[in-house]
């Protein structure tokens, strides 16, 4: 297991939830956290604890984003007009690595970031190697020709555990996706309940 794969499953164990809906998640086999004290019964969380957990879960879901990076995304969401929690989800789902993951070009969001960083993807015909690159509605994301037959890509397309959401149009024969629109929370196919309003409360303390 790679260091990044281990980190991914550590997030699942820490949250006590299979946050990506993966069949191999260790929480499918046990309902306690990592480490020797993981089986201890957890006490009721304080309001702060509930808010912190919601933030950690959302931050972890998008590839265990660094706190500084996640806070900057939140700050932009807060500056925008409208509901901050909806803005936050929209910004996270507009990331290039998130779209590559949603389009089922790769099996995990961690793989999506690495896939983009290694230059396997173009946006509107231009190679982009920054996972946090923000896509706009109408942008066309394509796997580069030399990368379309990579095993990781071929395996991801056939994954039955998740579907492509309706705000992304995908042609898996050509390995091309169009980001149709910025989604709202209710549009996003999270396998577990995400509570971005609690993230807003956390940063508004």
From Swiss-Prot:
GO cellular component, one term: small ribosomal subunit
Matches recorded under InterPro entries: Ribosomal_uS4 (IPR022801), Ribosomal_uS4_bac-type (IPR005709), Ribosomal_uS4_CS (IPR018079), Ribosomal_uS4_N (IPR001912), S4_RNA-bd (IPR002942), S4_RNA-bd_sf (IPR036986)
Annotated GO biological process: ribosomal small subunit biogenesis; translation
Region span, Disordered: 1-46
Gene Ontology terms for molecular function: rRNA binding; structural constituent of ribosome
Biased composition (Basic and acidic residues): 1-16
PANTHER family for this protein: 30S 40S RIBOSOMAL PROTEIN, SMALL RIBOSOMAL SUBUNIT PROTEIN US4M
Record's function text: One of the primary rRNA binding proteins, it binds directly to 16S rRNA where it nucleates assembly of the body of the 30S subunit.
Family per record: Belongs to the universal ribosomal protein uS4 family.
Name of the featured protein: Small ribosomal subunit protein uS4
Species annotation: Rhizobium leguminosarum bv. trifolii (strain WSM2304)
């Amino acid at each position: 297991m790679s260091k990044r794969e281990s980190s991914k499953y550590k997030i699942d164990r820490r949250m006590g939830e299979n946050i990506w809906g993966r069949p191999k998640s260790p929480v499918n086999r046990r309902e306690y956290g990592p480490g020797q004290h993981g089986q201890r019964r957890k006490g009721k969380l304080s309001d702060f604890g509930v808010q912190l957990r919601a933030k950690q879960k959302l931050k972890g879901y998008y590839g265990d984003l660094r706190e500084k990076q996640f806070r900057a995304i939140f700050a932009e969401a807060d500056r925008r007009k409208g509901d901050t929690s909806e803005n936050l989800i929209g910004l996270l789902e507009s990331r290039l690595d998130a779209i590559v993951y949603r389009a089922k070009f790769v099996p995990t969001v961690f793989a999506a970031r690495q896939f983009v960083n290694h230059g396997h993807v173009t946006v509107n015909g231009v190679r982009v190697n920054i996972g946090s690159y923000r896509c706009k509605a109408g942008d066309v994301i394509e796997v580069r020709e030399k990368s379309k037959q990579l095993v990781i890509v071929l395996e991801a397309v056939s994954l039955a555990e998740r579907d492509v959401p309706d705000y992304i149009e995908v042609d898996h024969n050509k390995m091309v996706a169009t980001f149709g629109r910025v989604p709202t929370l209710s549009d996003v196919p999270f396998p577990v309940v995400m509570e971005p309003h609690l993230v807003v409360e956390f940063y508004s303390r």
